[in-house]
Amino acid sequence: MAFTLPELPYPHDALAPIMSRETLEFHHDKHHLAYVNNGNNALKGTEWEGKPLEEIVKGSFGKNAAVFNNAGQHYNHTHFWKWMKPKGGGKTPGEVEKALKDGFGSVDKAKEDLIQAGVTQFGSGWAWLTLKDGKLSATKTANGENPLVHGGKPILGVDVWEHSYYIDYRNRRPDYLKAFVENLVNWDYVAERYAAAVK
């Protein structure tokens, strides 16, 4: 099925001042839309045309850069918008809290490790809380890659491409990541992704 741009689950100004209307207008309305359009063009006539998104991401990795880069970024961003909410952050739901404590020792350590993964990702990419072999860990990937292509399941991801933070934070990526973790994360959606991942 063709890629389509999902609507934001909140108004463009709902995450301000942590993430501005201008950032979301560029990031969602222009960058994500470009991945959708370029992905649809790249898919034409390939073996992945009409396949589910996750299957396209896994199948095209290492085989077709044009398909993979756009499919990967479409997948990542489709979840990224849902991983945020107005007045996010706060308490983690029970099952996720237990999993974070099992994987990291504490919820605070999980947050610190996620931030560190994002800070140390050289150039464009993503930082993740990843479920692999029954355990949660903080990981990072370059460009449009995600844990799916490395045998893991993403339960939370944060975009560290400059277009995700440069309007609001300029070169202060660590400040953006801290603000994301403390004020934007939609832990209910993280819990939903975790429940699906452990099935």
Task: Cite the ranges covered by each PLM segment.
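Feature for soluble, non-membrane regions of globular proteins
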Residues: 1-199
